[in-house]
UniProtKB/Swiss-Prot annotation:
Function description: Probably a 5'-3' DNA helicase.
UniProt-listed Enzyme Commission number(s): 5.6.2.3
Gene expressing this chain: yoaA
Record's keyword annotation contains Isomerase: yes
Gene3D superfamilies attached to this UniProt entry: P-loop containing nucleotide triphosphate hydrolases
Domain Helicase ATP-binding residue range list: 16-278
Protein name: ATP-dependent DNA helicase YoaA
Cofactor comment text: Binds 1 [4Fe-4S] cluster.
Amino acid sequence: MDYENQIANIFSLNGELSQNIKGFRPRAEQLEMAYAVGKAIQNKSSLVIEAGTGTGKTFAYLAPALVFGKKTIISTGSKNLQDQLFNRDLPAIKKALNFTGKIALLKGRANYLCLERLDQVIAQGVLGDKSVLAELSKVRKWNNSTKTGDFTECIELAEDSPIIPQLTSTAESCLGTDCPNYSECYVASARKKALNADLVVVNHHLFFADMAVKESGFGELIPNAEVIIFDEAHQLPDIASQYFGQSLTSRQLFDLCKDINIVYRTELKDMQQLGTTSDTLLKVVQDFRLLLGNGSNVRGNWRELYTQSAVKKAFELLQEKIDFLSEVIKLALGRSQTLDSIFERVESIKIQLKRLSETNIVGYCYWYEGNGRQFGLHITPLTVADKFGAQLEAKEAAWIFTSATLEVGGTFNHFCQRLGIENATQKILYSPFNYPEQSLLCVPRYLPNTNQMNTLNSLGEILLPVIEANKGRCFVLCTSYSMMRGLAEYFREKSHLSILLQGETSKGKLLEQFIKETHSVLVATSSFWEGVDVRGDALSLVIIDKLPFTAPDEPLLKARIEDCRLQGGDPFNDIQIPEAVITLKQGVGRLIRDVTDRGVVIICDNRLVMRNYGETFLKSLPNSSRTRDLNKVIQFLQNK
């Protein structure tokens, strides 16, 4: 039987999926996507496919991948989707199709408990207060029962717990086969399973870490793959940029100092100079950290900052101390395997520092971020099209890129150009939802000018009656932290509804609370614009404060704008609009998640109707009914 008939049978009314998966119903769009994926796998070709919400794209790419049975990598944008795929979707479809191959889940090492670090922390004590000590005892208890060491499974631990960085290894600090705990290592075990599996679920960060630096032990995965499927593919260009660049972080430097001190105190007690030099470096790193932000999150241009004499002086002192540390370690080389591996890290940091001082190299953005507690110095390529495009050419495999948000104004040009994708089959599959019936899009009249000082209160005044008429059940998605905090404060002052604010607890807990407290309002920013799935009555109103253009002074964007201009392009139309369109599509996509959902999206930005480019945004959004009258919005919400 050819693959098309096989796929048609799987997705038919009486097929394997209908018979084995509760609630499965055949969808024309899903079948069309499954055919396209199957064809790409058979021909070892590239496919770029946008599948609107409700298409059922996960099964549409999983079924053909399992049918062909080739070595497959599936890469997701978020760890949430990665876990959902591995723990929910894959077991269901594997059982339905009676697939007997091996499947594996692989994350980056920062997700796994490091037993060597755990031993060190138990021996030396944790960094932090009593609450961190309590977290440690939770981890020790969990370690007795876990088979994977994946922190996601430790449900008693918050995802942003301060204990996690103390208990995970980094590529630099990992001792590899020299580690006394290597035989029980969770990272090594996960990688071994991945290498032996027929289908591996990874995330984009891990995929590009491997592609860019060939981190030892994982380098064999991509070369063996015959099918590579990227879900949430709209995130790829930005993630790829991070990995084809260079970064030096305060964590790398603090970890280095800590590890040197451990060697001095345990293995080389006679090397007092080692401890002294490490302590001096630690002090220099702490001082340098304070120059890059003092509490608030700061991102800026490293080239510009490096011209300031105080920063340059502090940076040169950092280089000097690293050079001296290298000389001190040389005196003890061969006496400790741990110190030998630390020496390699120091040499690598020396190279990174040298590159960060060579700020005149073109084609890269030099930028920094800091908040008083930690910092990062980065060199990011302005384009990854040549590097990624070369990988596509060199590797004979099926490359499949899918997301609900890839096209802008009816084409994939922006996405394909950023990744150097050529000669790919391109397809747009529209959502099967009845948007004109299920949803209403409103750009209200009489909106305050976005530049006015009183915007916040005026906006709150306009929106609160609608939110209260809907009894909450609302996401307010903001484009800045100041607007997010300001609106939350306004609603808390003026309304009796439960107002939840991003950052006050973890993302998972906020969503849980939002669904449980039926009359609540969640005010959030970037991380809630995508990857959040709330179905049914719990969410029937999504408010977006303005079009999500990235601030033009954001260092990476600024560098790309300058580069585009130098090449004779139009940065606003070529870069800023396409990226804002994709972000807006993600935000709007939070509303209608199922055939029975109904609700309203309010976008508080006149530019959608007053500027020519507004049409590009509107064309890319679902074809909801439209109004500018908030009374009609209230009517629609009350007639649900």
